[in-house]
Amino acid sequence: HENSSAASDVYKRQDREQIMYYKEDKKGIILEEGINEAGAMSAWLALATSYSTHQQAMIPFYIFYSMFGFQRIGDLAWASGDSQARGFLIGATAGRTTLNGEGLQHQDGHSHILANTIPNCKSYDATYAYELAVIIQDGLERMYGKKENFFYYITTMNENYNHPSIPDGVEQGIIAGVYKVDSIKLTKNKKKSINVNLMGAGTILHEVIAASKILADDYSITSDIWSLTSINELVRDGQEIDRWNMLNPEKNKKMAYIERILEDSNGPFVIATDYMKAYGEQLRKYIPDDLHVLGTDGFGRSDSRETLRNFFEVDRYFIVIATLNILAQQDKISANELKRAIKTFDIDVDKLNPLIL
């Protein structure tokens, strides 16, 4: 072989015929680390701190199974925060139910909870490509334009679904952590109905949308659909506002971002994510009406996505049941209507809690 140079490859690579061949290029490089999370994270950390150690900023992306991120190399992630790293961690195949067939070891239901323990890690659970683009653009501006010492953790899925074009004016909400995706109304010949707020994140947002259509078609219940791009960012903002209000009692109270966005909302709330209930429960204080949280507590299972979401009780039918339950508690519908829905969806009321299985 000839020697390599800083300019580019100047030698013939023996693995050139492979898909993931080794390549050096001024425009960037891909390191295929294999099953070596500690080594890969160390490489990312070296690049993420190069702005300081070498006075040359790099923009590293480390893509990995989300279960094998913070859970496996948590101390290195903490060191990344301590070292003021800048870069992107991409938790692929994220969520408890999106990675069907790989069971307990691979299915992640808590990486966002772990990410939130690192003060300068900003974490997002994106559903659509336009959300991902907005988040990455914001990260590039903050880390490399304004030179702020954050790093980003973004979860992505391996599930195929349609990605719509970006709606007008949603960028601020995506970055802050929540925005309205749609409002589901009834046909004109139907009377004024009950309204609810359905909030979803990541791949489970599609189950939320499907549930909203069932509620409209079968129960004459309208809904506002919200994408929760970052529960953690919303909670941090809320806690910052709480602190300010506590320390400034003589001044007018401020409102958290999510409180301002939901101030004029109508009806109770259901939050459904592909993560443990504790993730969504963080928002309870800032929700202006009754709230029911669905999540994927328990160990993973090997099965289809449809079966997994039913098992963990986060599919469209459990979202409908949770909605009807909260409406029954508010005396807006009868308990019998809830009971009929449980029978209609063939839900086993004696089903064991997935947490204990």
Where are the language model's segments positioned?
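Single conserved hydrophobic/aromatic residue that forms the stacking wall/gate
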Residues: 1-7, 11
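Active-site-adjacent bridging/hinge elements
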Residues: 9-25, 293-295
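Thiamine diphosphate
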Residues: 19, 53-55, 97-106, 116, ...
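Active-site nucleophile and cofactor-binding loops and adjacent substrate-binding regions
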Residues: 22-41, 62-70, 91-94, 100, ...
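Conserved phosphate/anionic-ligand binding catalytic regions in large, soluble enzymes, centered on
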Residues: 33-51, 319
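A short, small-residue-rich loop immediately preceding and capping a beta-strand
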Residues: 54-67, 88-91, 198-200
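A glycine-rich helix N-cap at a beta->alpha junction
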Residues: 79-95
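Hydrophobic, small-residue-rich alpha-helical packing segments that form membrane-like cores
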Residues: 111-118, 128
